[in-house]
């Protein structure tokens, strides 16, 4: 997904190829030009788009909260599925529009257009799968530009990622454990379980800190429960997938029969197709909580 803000005249600066796009021009772009257009738009600041993942028996719903006044290029849908617009108003590329409430079967292809009013859009798929990466490989066909962007972000080296890895080594000494022990614990699969049915604001993806991590897909407020990490001794992705940080944005809390992860501060979510902040914890703190349950 690529999304950027336009002004009241439907114009936005796009660099380096052109300086402005008129709304009428945008709505008449030929589909074969979309990938080039998408690459141009990736040079712009992307708008926040909360993506919330809903899991229920036999159903995965991908909710996107689309801000008014933006032009959106969605990922290509690989299969027919149910579309639900709970509220909002979208004008589509090439003509046509949808006003909520609206429901229809979405055919394979890309949806592009201007968000005329704040919109809640749901893609609904028939599946029992709960891993977002697997779900995306099943139902989405991302462009080369989108894939390249994800790889670049996963390999980004920042002061924060360097500090996280350095403090990880200090944490090993503090807890008197080895990297091999921590890696083996994270990789152990016999105690893994799926998340309970419900709605979640995160996903797992390759991390610039280490291996795979957990990233916010929607804005999470300080004090908000992100989800369960441990349920009666069984671990969810929050229990085995969160990376350590010297400056964590989340912490572990003991609950009746398990452990939950709570936001320590506000955590930013997706900006269009760009993942939000990586959710991190201090393993020293989470270890203390785990030991208290024994």
What are these regions (language model features)?
Residues 63, 89-112:
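Short acidic-glycine-tyrosine-enriched beta hairpin
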Residues 77-94:
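Glycine- and acidic-residue-biased ligand/ion/polar-headgroup-sensing regions
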Residues 1-63:
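A short, N-terminal "cap"/entry segment at the start of jelly-roll beta-barrel domains
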């Amino acid at each position: 997904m690529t999304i950027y803000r336009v002004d009241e005249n439907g114009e936005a600066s796009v660099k380096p190829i052109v300086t402005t796009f008129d709304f009428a021009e945008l709505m008449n772009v030929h589909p074969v030009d979309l990938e080039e257009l998408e690459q141009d738009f990736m040079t712009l600041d992307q708008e926040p788009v909360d993506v919330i993942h809903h899991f229920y028996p036999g159903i995965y719903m991908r909710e996107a909260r689309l801000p008014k006044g933006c032009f959106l290029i969605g990922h290509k849908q690989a299969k027919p599925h149910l579309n639900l617009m709970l509220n909002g108003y979208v004008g589509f590329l090439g003509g046509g529009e949808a006003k909520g409430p609206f429901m229809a079967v979405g055919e394979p292809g890309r949806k592009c257009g201007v968000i005329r009013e704040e919109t809640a859009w749901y893609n609904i798929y028939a599946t029992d799968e709960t891993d977002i990466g697997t779900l995306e490989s099943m139902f989405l066909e991302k462009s080369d530009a989108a894939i390249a962007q994800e790889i670049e972000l996963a390999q980004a080296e920042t002061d924060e990622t360097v500090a996280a890895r350095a403090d990880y080594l200090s944490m090993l000494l503090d807890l008197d454990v080895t990297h091999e022990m921590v890696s083996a614990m994270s990789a152990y699969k016999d105690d893994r379980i799926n998340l309970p049915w419900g709605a979640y604001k995160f996903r797992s993806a390759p991390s610039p800190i280490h291996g795979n991590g957990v990233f916010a897909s929607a804005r999470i407020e300080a004090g908000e429960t992100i989800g369960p990490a441990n349920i009666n001794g069984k671990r969810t992705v929050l229990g085995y997938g969160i990376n350590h940080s010297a400056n964590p944005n989340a912490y572990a809390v003991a609950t009746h029969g398990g452990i939950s992860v709570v936001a320590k501060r506000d955590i930013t979510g997706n900006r269009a197709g760009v993942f939000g902040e990586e959710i991190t914890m201090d393993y020293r703190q989470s270890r203390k909580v785990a030991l208290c349950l024994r």
